[in-house]
Amino acid sequence: MTRTAVLLLTLLFLVAMAASDKIKTRELCWTEEECENWE
């Protein structure tokens, strides 16, 4: 695998993790800005 492919897969993985974290912690967020600070 090329380094570019590895970077793309890593980015996709991080985005997926961030999305699942948002779903899990959505009720803990008061505002959209605080939600983004969870990352």
From Swiss-Prot:
Name recorded for this polypeptide: Contryphan-Cal2
Protein task: Probable neurotoxin.
Tissue expression from the record: Expressed by the venom duct.
One GO MF term attached to the UniProt entry: toxin activity
Subcellular location: Secreted
Keywords for the protein's UniProt record, in alphabetical order: Disulfide bond, Neurotoxin, Secreted, Signal, Toxin
Domain notes per entry: The cysteine framework is C-C.
GO cellular component, one term: extracellular region
Signal peptide start and end residues: 1-20
Disulfide bridge positions per record: C29-C35
Chief place where the protein resides: secreted
